Amino acid sequence: MKSILENRPELAYEVNQAAEVAGYLWQKGWAERNGGNITLNITEYVDDEIRALPAISEVKQIGKVLPYLKACYFYCKGTQMRMRDLARWPMANGSIIRILDDCASYVIIADQPVMPTSELPSHLAVHNYLLEKGSPYRASLHTHPIELIAMTHNKKFLEKDVAKIGRASCRER
């Protein structure tokens, strides 16, 4: 079976960019084994042939209606897949999904029926928000940095003063 990426250089480039990011996360120790998720909106690279592809999975419920995602397509990291493997073989460790017309469900259309991670509804909600606001951003990513996880298991790092310093260093505040 040929890959959906064949003869689609722009789509292949975007999926390979996500794979490259997965590689960086793995190499830098910023992703704990299979922890984390990458979801990429690829709708602008979808052609009529892709739109006509049949589902290769059952219909899956998102759990919420996301109206801005109608007829959108996403590349998603698969559940229990490692970032290092996604970096080498993105279509064996992820899949392409189509959001259905009800805006509350999706199907996998390529290349293999690799189920997205459990964080997919959260990522899709982020994409829905980005589209609603007219944002040019097309990727949603989260991960579990190994060292940060290790720190949360150390009593010293759970003490009030150290935790306060850690929170103060976050730019998001």
Q: What do these predicted ranges mean?
A:
Residues 1-173:
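Glycine-rich flexible loops
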